[in-house]
């Protein structure tokens, strides 16, 4: 190779410019750490196609993929949180609300919709964990009560997907009151003979697990979901004992009778639809009959 060819030999040139890959194209599984194509993961309902790990899912996306596409109507969207106590810790509560609304694209931590599931009428709600850890404040409680009222008005079942760290500390006693408020609303639903399906997703903790999340006529856990009241370390320090591995996972809770079944997210529509048809004595051409087994 001549000196001139050496100068123009492109194989010796190393580009310093990085390949332009749009943000969000790839996602790493939080369990097996495989790099996944985001569009494929979304089509698979945020379940890893490699290891079946159920990743956290946006509340609105969950409801849109759970309910039938036609006839969905949002309930309680007009309710927005207010800083009544003028609460301030390291940051003003008012500022925390604004930041959470911007990052989550939701006005609070619960989204409620009325619609149909496999052509059967239903009201469904889902917690948005990215909004202050899915914490339950006065707006979450009020929206849940509206969901119960809508189910009673339409004489249909209620489904709730929980994903929460518990009561919202910035609302103090008002947030704790939501535990009683939501429980009382579910008692009204029960008196009407309408079923409540509680789906416990990762994580369901604190005041939400101690109230509405465990009051389902049928309590369903997603695979390996973290479900409990206090964290492992707090419990071990209190009881002064070592606790079994995975004692707050849905599989352990199913084994010990705390929940009724574990259902893969990709099968949730058919499973709940079948249970709804059976419990309300309705028929739908889209429902596959259930045998009642776990």
From Swiss-Prot:
Entry keywords, A to Z: ATP-binding, Cytoplasm, Fatty acid biosynthesis, Fatty acid metabolism, Lipid biosynthesis, Lipid metabolism, Metal-binding, Nucleotide-binding, Transferase, Zinc, Zinc-finger
Listed GO biological process terms: fatty acid biosynthetic process; malonyl-CoA biosynthetic process
Domain of life of the source: Bacteria
Cofactor: Zn(2+)
Domain spans labelled CoA carboxyltransferase N-terminal: 25-294
The keyword Lipid metabolism is assigned to this record: yes
Molecular-function GO terms, alphabetical: acetyl-CoA carboxylase activity; ATP binding; carboxyl- or carbamoyltransferase activity; zinc ion binding
Positions of disulphide bridges: none
Cofactor binding, note field: Binds 1 zinc ion per subunit.
Pathway(s) annotated for this protein in UniProt: Lipid metabolism; malonyl-CoA biosynthesis; malonyl-CoA from acetyl-CoA: step 1/1
InterPro entries for the chain: AcCoA_carboxyl_beta, Acetyl_CoA_COase_Trfase_b_su, ClpP/crotonase-like_dom_sf, COA_CT_N, Znf-ACC
Assigned EC number: 2.1.3.15
Reaction catalyzed: N(6)-carboxybiotinyl-L-lysyl-[protein] + acetyl-CoA = N(6)-biotinyl-L-lysyl-[protein] + malonyl-CoA
Residues given in the record as Zn(2+) binding sites: 29, 32, 48, 51
Quaternary assembly: Acetyl-CoA carboxylase is a heterohexamer composed of biotin carboxyl carrier protein (AccB), biotin carboxylase (AccC) and two subunits each of ACCase subunit alpha (AccA) and ACCase subunit beta (AccD).
Function: Component of the acetyl coenzyme A carboxylase (ACC) complex. Biotin carboxylase (BC) catalyzes the carboxylation of biotin on its carrier protein (BCCP) and then the CO(2) group is transferred by the transcarboxylase to acetyl-CoA to form malonyl-CoA.
Family: Belongs to the AccD/PCCB family.
Protein name (Swiss-Prot/TrEMBL): Acetyl-coenzyme A carboxylase carboxyl transferase subunit beta
Protein source organism: Aliivibrio fischeri (strain ATCC 700601 / ES114) (Vibrio fischeri)
Gene: accD
